Amino acid sequence: MKVTILGAGAWGTAIASQAARQQSAGDVSLWSRDPSQLLEIEKTGENQAYLPGIKLPKSIKLENDFSNAIQRLSSNDLLVIATPMSGLSQTIAQVLKLAKQPLNIIWLCKGLEPNTSLLPHQVVERENSLHNHGIKHAYGALSGPSFAHEVGAGMPCALTVASTSTSLCEIVQAAFHHGNMRIYSSDDLIGVELGGAVKNVLAIAAGIGDGLNLGLNARAAVLTRGLAEMMRLVKAVGGKSETCMGLTGVGDLILTATGDLSRNRRVGLELAAGKSLPEILANLGHVAEGVLCAAAVGDLAKRLDVEMPITAMMGDVLSGQLTPQDAVKKLMGRDPKIET
């Protein structure tokens, strides 16, 4: 099996390493639009810009030609889109224009499209309707609690591939399920993708609570009530609320809200310290998807009349309408309710 990964950021590089541990030499290709980045990887044996300290398998083929990266694949191979959510639309459009035969496609990004509040698979379906040449592709999402650095280092990890295609799930499992990585399968794309989007926003809230020294009780309340918000939204959109109790919901939420490697948690910590969002993002150096999708999640909840107070407050904090301290006061001042 050949595996092509589009995007040589931290997660793309990590998942390429995982695939290379299983596949034969030359079967795993890592594409980057930046030739200087690939030269640096070839020279040093690691992606110093995004995954420093992790030596990459020498069998990974480094690719700068987008067309070659796509056209090397057959209908039995796997294409992995490892761009951020902001790059998904453009990347999948390019893929569909070049595809000459059915492809197996998964994406790793988590979030919603700004302005439209579309889930990743809905973005893919939109682009498929515009650029498809009558070819039926199989597609899905790979998600779950995973820091790229730990995956790159080969540490234990469990993820979920979500797709309506059983064969795609089996291909993804064949590519990545080995050694210290387990891959579970699901047919609930909505639940898996929304869990990955909402948990990033909730991780910012947890970071704010920790940064304000509100205590472990407060953190537990944020995670528990945040999970309830996630489940309500998943059900309203048409997914399975029970999916939120798995790896891509509560599992990813726990990791992102409490792990020190979490960029979204770090945003919350620094907001609580009084730093401005532009300053935080400039120092971060990498994408924090919770910042980008908070407004989109809030818009989707309003459209569907789903109550998500923690998520809504995070949207107000990130847009500068509320300070972290005022957001806490508003949340704690809400009327008593039955727990649902």
Swiss-Prot record:
A Pfam family annotated for this UniProt entry: NAD_Gly3P_dh_C
EC number: 1.1.1.94
Catalytic residues, chain numbering: 199
Gene Ontology terms describing biological process: carbohydrate metabolic process; glycerol-3-phosphate biosynthetic process; glycerol-3-phosphate catabolic process; glycerophospholipid metabolic process; phospholipid biosynthetic process
This protein's UniProt keywords: Cytoplasm, Lipid biosynthesis, Lipid metabolism, NAD, NADP, Nucleotide-binding, Oxidoreductase, Phospholipid biosynthesis, Phospholipid metabolism
Matches recorded under InterPro entries: 6-PGluconate_DH-like_C_sf, 6PGD_dom2, G3P_DH_NAD-dep, G3P_DH_NAD-dep_C, G3P_DH_NAD-dep_N, NAD(P)-bd_dom_sf
A GO MF term: NAD binding
Protein task: Catalyzes the reduction of the glycolytic intermediate dihydroxyacetone phosphate (DHAP) to sn-glycerol 3-phosphate (G3P), the key precursor for phospholipid synthesis.
Full protein name: Glycerol-3-phosphate dehydrogenase [NAD(P)+]
Source organism (scientific name): Polynucleobacter asymbioticus (strain DSM 18221 / CIP 109841 / QLW-P1DMWA-1)
Taxonomic placement: Bacteria, Pseudomonadati, Pseudomonadota, Betaproteobacteria, Burkholderiales
Name of the coding gene: gpsA
